[in-house]
Amino acid sequence: QFDKLTPELYGAVIDEAHQHGLRVTAHVYTLEDAKGLLRAGLDAFAHGIRDTDVDDEVLELFRERPDVVLVPNLPGSGFAADLSWLSGTIPADELTQMQERSVDRPAAQEAFGIQARNLARLSAEGVTIAFGTDGGAGWSPHAEMEDMVRAGMSPGDVLVAATRNSADLLMLDDLGTLEAGKSA
């Protein structure tokens, strides 16, 4: 566990940022923190609620703030992964070390299950979902998209999250969709 900003302090930070035309994103893990940040005017969440299932109150707060974006950054399923498909793409000793570290972790499985249910429900309720990963470059974005589908989003919705919604979140008007005048 780590120290967190108080609602008064993060509210002041959000207000000050907005006065200067800046948007604010915060890491969130708990339902109560999400509610407080939504009330304070947060623009986007990195990660998602993983301590308990979302309730009607937080859904109403999201409805009141339709421009808020959720970037789930799912924590990984917690199940040992078969990484053999990486053979030949990275040094064999690194692959062996990665496979040895990939073990079943019950706590991670529980957190993934909660966050996956919440992602599915928030997506179904119309919350804008964008894309991010804490796994670094390379194959991890693909694993993140697979986890988003495993969580209950449709493959099409995941592609929209990874392209259009992410470009919109980053205010990259020339990216995100295949349209005349945009970079492909």
Segments the model singles out, each with a brief description of its role:
Residues Q1-F112, G136, D168-L170:
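Active-site core of metal-dependent hydrolases
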